[in-house]
Amino acid sequence: MKGTIVLYPAMGRGHIVPMVELGKFLSTHHHATLSVKILLPSPPNSTTLRYITAVSAATPSITFLHLSPSQHLLRVLQTLISQSSKPKAFILDFFNHSAADVTQTLNIPTYYYFPNAASCVALMLYTPTIHHNTKNGNSSYNDTLRRIPGLPPLSPEDMPAPLLDRRSFESFANMSIQMRKSDGIIVNTFEKLENKAFLALKNGTCVSETSRSHSSTPETRKPRIFCVGPLVSNGGGEHDNDDSGCMSWLDLQPSRTVVFLSFGSYGRFSKSQIREIALGLERSGQRFLWVVRDPYERSELSLEELLPKGFLERTKERGMVVKNWAPQVKVLSHDSVGGFVTHCGWNSVLEAVSWGVPMVAWPLYAEQRLNRVVMVEEMKVALPLKEVDEDGFVRASELEERVRELMDSERGRGKEVRKRVLGATNDAVAALSDGGSSRIELNDLVGLWMQ
């Protein structure tokens, strides 16, 4: 009889897709022993729904259960148990941490899944130590950020906004303690991509300081870590009819000559910043494909209203601008794309690494500033953009210089990041191949469930 594994992603494409990709991998490689069920928060947006529909058709062994807001998780799990048997494991997104109370009540082995960098997990696990040291006056907040195990020295500006607020920080520290009590933490990364953070997680140095300053309890134990990535979408469920024409346009461009600019589902700029980006691209002289979303001041503006007068006409021979959305995986995997200006969302980073595309790092929100530090200083697969103020405004001249530098594959930093990302691509393929580090971790995980 197959063992049932239940996956519970948080809302949002950036959380649903990597969780579903984990389910796909488990179902594909362990179909004889595992039955995978995914609880979906309802309702997903149209883009995510297309993706889920495509996965469901291609991998019918996965069962998708759509949760309505009124459904209680306890009743859903009790129904699953009555229909078959108790799940072998329950894997939840860290944003759904309250679900652990339910799974522990039912005595179901519980794992947290991070669709984030190992560096972010290391920071998360270290938050109780930061809280303890700063609260007791052992060290300042700034000093503590410079010595987080597995991470390069950080500044407060590199931290996610909630970790700069005392009350929110305490909530994250408490969440970290709860995670340490779990059966394990699964991370969408691989050993060679983030080796220092990987070792810090595996060796438990992210929690060891807390353990030294407290008696040994479940709150201070080292959780088991499983790095299983890169688990990324293959583009299934993205538009096949090329409504915008961007894929047809890419077909006409020379190999590795186009820089792609896209900033995620929530990446919006002011109208003035959009115009600054346009000027930088025009002056760079590079071919480009740019996804423009409405500015946060107004919506439903045409490209002509958003962009500098005459920009589209002046750049039509070497550039294309599309409104709101492009099939990112298909774009990054296209032969003509040679660079990526990204908001540093972890899914986007893994997609670029998987397809060998070097990046310019332009973080906007959440943990993306932390990702930038790691991408630039540790992974060395991206160039940083300099911002002129605390709101993150970037001048046209800065974007112009970085895009030119990135697309110059013959010399300087552009050549170096291209070399590094191509090496990371090979490492990514190896990690998920038979005998690779991530494949071994996944097999070990399944072995634990089926004992």
Swiss-Prot record:
SUPFAM superfamilies referenced in this protein's UniProt entry, alphabetically: UDP-Glycosyltransferase/glycogen phosphorylase (SSF53756)
Induction info: Down-regulated by methyl jasmonate.
UniProt signal peptide: none
Pfam families: UDPGT
Entry EC number(s): 2.4.1.170
Chain positions recorded as an anthocyanidin binding sites: H15, A366
Keyword presence, Repressor: no
Keywords tagged on the record: Glycosyltransferase, Transferase
Catalytic activity reported: a 7-hydroxyisoflavone + UDP-alpha-D-glucose = a 7-hydroxyisoflavone 7-O-beta-D-glucoside + UDP + H(+)
rRNA-binding keyword on record: no
Catalytic residues as annotated in Swiss-Prot or TrEMBL: H15 (proton acceptor), D93 (charge relay)
Residues holding UDP-alpha-D-glucose: A326, Q328, H343, W346, N347, S348, E351, E367, Q368
GO terms, molecular function: isoflavone 7-O-glucosyltransferase activity
Expression (tissue specificity): Expressed in roots. Detected in stems and leaves.
UniProt record similarity statement: Belongs to the UDP-glycosyltransferase family.
Role this protein plays: Isoflavone 7-O-glucosyltransferase converting daidzein to daidzin, genistein to genistin and formononetin to ononin. Shows some activity toward the flavanones liquiritigenin and naringenin, but not toward cyanidin, isoliquiritigenin, apigenin, luteolin, kaempferol, quercetin, daidzin and puerarin.
Protein name stated in the entry: UDP-glycosyltransferase 13
Biological source species: Pueraria montana var. lobata
